[in-house]
Amino acid sequence: MGRGKIEIKRIENSSNRQVTYSKRRNGILKKAKEISVLCDARVSVIIFASSGKMHEFSSTSLVDILDQYHKLTGRRLLDAKHENLDNEINKVKKDNDNMQIELRHLKGEDITSLNHRELMILEDALENGLTSIRNKQNEVLRMMRKKTQSMEEEQDQLNCQLRQLEIATMNRNMGEIGEVFQQRENHDYQNHMPFAFRVQPMQPNLQERL
């Protein structure tokens, strides 16, 4: 009894769909390998699952197969994308060339071919550029002056604190020196006093002298 013909439509059950995909995918890759070996054919197969996972087989370099495809068909894959990319590259190159020309003009180079209107536009651009440069220069100078003033004020504060510290140290030293001189003066004064006026540590009993 032969197998019934399977209706070709999307399998709704996700589990059954995944099982069928795995079996059919393996079968396609197997057939691709077989035909490449049996018939010496150049075969390339790329399969993308619904999940985005890719499976592939290529009997030779995929790049070589694509090059041969391009030569034989005269068509390139992703022509629209490549065309847009080429247009974008050409636009960038053109913009870069124009910027190089403008830069040379701003430097005073290659301006002999410019007409009066173009020279006026160039002059305005230079004046605007000079104005921007002067404004930036003035801004930098203001910042430098402000920073210098702040540093000078900080230096003045440090000098004031240092001076106060020096004065306090000097006063302390003078006080210590004054105490030393006072002690010396007291000692010298006692040494020059008459013997009768000197304070004796002990006075003998006057009755014992009599």
From Swiss-Prot:
It is found in: Nucleus. GO terms for cellular component: nucleus. Gene3D superfamilies: Transcription factor, MADS-box. It comes from the Eukaryota. One of its GO terms (molecular function) is RNA polymerase II transcription regulatory region sequence-specific DNA binding. GO terms for biological process: positive regulation of transcription by RNA polymerase II. It holds the Pfam family SRF-TF. Residues 3-57 form the MADS-box domain. Keywords: DNA-binding, Nucleus, Transcription, Transcription regulation. Signal peptide: none annotated. InterPro entries: MADS-box/MEF2_TF (IPR050142), MEF2-like_N (IPR033896), TF_Kbox (IPR002487), TF_MADSbox (IPR002100), TF_MADSbox_sf (IPR036879). Residues 82-173 form the K-box domain. Petals. Probable transcription factor. This is Floral homeotic protein FBP1. The gene is FBP1.
